[in-house]
Amino acid sequence: MPKTTKNPADYILPLYMNGLAGRMLRIAPPKNNQREVLFIYGHHASLERYFGVADLMSRYGGLSVPDLPGFGGMDPFYKIGEKPTLDNFADYLASFIKLRYKNKRFVVAGYSLGVVIITRMLQKYPELTKKVDMVISIGGFSHRSDFSFSRQRYWIYRLGLAFFSYRLPAALYKHIVLRPMYIRYIYRHMFNAQQKFKGKSGGELKRTIEMEVDLWRSNDPRTYMATGHMMITLDLPSLGHVGLPIYHAGVVGDHYFHNIKVEQHLRQIYADFHYGKIKSLTHAPSIVATAEDAAMFLPKEFIRVMKKLG
């Protein structure tokens, strides 16, 4: 089957929320299908990076993907005098849902950090669970001990992220380190980048590197660092229960997370847990451009459940 050649720009609309300007991806539902699907992307992301996942999910309902403050080129919380805390992201998502869906029901899916934000939103706004038909986690997590880093690497990340989340260090990082030349020729050899670029060569490697350049230049570095620190100190199980089942797709051999610990912690939060496998070389590829590229991230058993929804 040939890959689709849809252009993300054809589906992107302006988004203005709580004094912040960003974008939203909207794909109309298939014919005779009134189901709605909300997708929340992960850390270090944009609408373009995960367009393939959005395109795939749009086969099962009308698809909406809002930018997150500080990511994808959207204004950061700092612009309105707020910080990118998990509760602020949860409040933002709840506001979007109330405005977008009103009396409609919907499926909500998240990728990595997106699952964290969805979970906190459902904990904080339990009344919204009545509108949710299904919660899907793709490479999601809920607790700091889910990370598989060595103790030394964990503390390097934790202290480094905390330091660069301050205004001056973040500004220096943006204007000195995040230059396109650095990203193209030095960043590609670092630990995290090597995981993303594994198995890529030639034109595919070049496209992946250019996507990384776009991501680092469009995302707010201070927000990136602050949310990274939030993730690496996370403890969602202590913040409440969610009275819904979660359908979690875990990456086999994920270089970031212990899948068993991820399951244990999600079971503590959600009413039930259903597991599906993702066979991927990395936790999150730099580009998921088409529905065909994204097919491995949505297990067939999850698709069957979605198709049975009213």
Language-model segments: residues:
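Catalytic active-site module of serine/aspartate enzymes centered on a nucleophile-bearing elbow/loop
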Residues: 269-310
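Conserved serine/cysteine hydrolase catalytic core
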Residues: 214-263
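Conserved HGGG/HGGXW glycine-rich cap/lid loop of the alpha/beta-hydrolase fold
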Residues: 23-76
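Alpha/beta-hydrolase fold catalytic core
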Residues: 1-37, 58-61, 101-102, 289, ...
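Flexible "cap/lid" loop of the alpha/beta hydrolase fold
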Residues: 130-172
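Active-site loop/oxyanion-hole signature of alpha/beta-hydrolase fold enzymes
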Residues: 68-111, 128
